[in-house]
Amino acid sequence: MKILFTFLLWAVCALLAQARDYVITDYGAKSDTSAVCTAVLQQCIDLCSTNGGGRVVIPAGDYKTGSIVLRSNVHLHLELGATLYGSTDLRDYHRMTTSYKSLRTHTPTIQLIYADSVDNVVIDGYGTIDGQGRVFPKRSWNDEGITRPHLLRFVQSRNITVKDVTLRNSGCWMQHYLACDRVRISGIRVTNRNNYNNDALDLDGCHDVIVSDVLADSDDDGITLKSTSPRLCEDITIQNCIVSSHCNAVKLGTETNGGFRNIVIRGIVVKPSADQSSRFFGRPIGTSALSLEIVDGGTMENVTVSDLSVEGTESPIFVRLGHRGRGWTFSQSGAEAFVAQSLSGGNEGVTRSQKPDSVETVGRIRSIYINHVRVKNAGNYGCSITGLPDHPVEDVHVSDVSIHHRGGVKEADLNAINKALQDEKAAEYPEATMWGPLPARGFYVRHARGVSFDRVETTTEAPDVRPELVQEDVE
């Protein structure tokens, strides 16, 4: 009995220790953005983790920080009325390295909040994290995370929860989850429209993820799955989100070295941003609502998309198997040149050795199911499902889709439209608008096998001479 009592007392004490709050103002942080409170924040995080876990609490007020590193069993809680600003001085950002190898980790990276190989971490509350990312200029085509910080980055971590917080104004991608397992993201509000490469959310080679009830407004892509290493994105659900994007609202790609398997996308509302005061990429009404891409090798399979409500976008649905062939490894000299070019801001004279190694194998897209999609006020590009000669897209099933768009294509336009399609553009960056308006007002299908349509209808605002469906090299 005494042994049992001792054990229970130990367990209660352990739980109490884990539940402890570390309020940053108790450790010297002040609501004052004239100076950073990085050291205090990091002290609280380290103490919390060392003592078995608990909450690091940011109370109401305005605070400024440079890079902080999260630890296992830490719950970062932002109270209502709390705003944590990122420093606008790059000297306050630490260059971080990781043992995980991917296209995005060959060089040290900078981010406001970073975690590597952690377990059981939570970021939540009704406060705000603001990266103040507009002050970091784009210096070269590959400077994301090198001269412009991510706001939030998790690498090879497990049991991650991000809930209810507002995230805004990152220097590049807002959130990058790389090779993470068991991630839950819900109820967050993301505004990222102040710089180039302003994605709202990037899941990269992650497993067992649920993204739900997210409100996202981004200049670049909205909710994006990537694969910048051989590790697939697998067993991921994206549901009940509202997304505004000048580019692709929901996207699988562009990096696809591993690929995507068992992906569910449902209950998504896509609409143009109410704020059109600035634009770095894309189109005011968005480029696409749904982009499914394999262009760097890899396989996409078992993707189910349902219940999309779309306002705008130039080309609502884009399925593309291409062969850009960008790998995830570098020669050593190439990696050094890659970061040196980014830091110098130079774009000229980039040689092949400065770019990632090539992928020789064309990837694969198969078993895609798209159902119950409603589109209104779209552009007149049309939708497309395209592979390459001898590399068809396979088993794509589209049902219960209605699209209303601008229309207006005339007989005199068809020659130019068909001429543009003579170029397969196999190695080009995939974009739903890459060929211009398509030969079909509804769906253009090329190099495909086992594609089916059921209850698909396209109507146009202005008369449009194109047929609803055009298929080439289709079995």
Residue spans for each PLM region:
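Extracellular/periplasmic carbohydrate-active domains that bind, remodel
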Residues: L16-E475
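Bacterial N-terminal signal peptides
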Residues: F5-A14
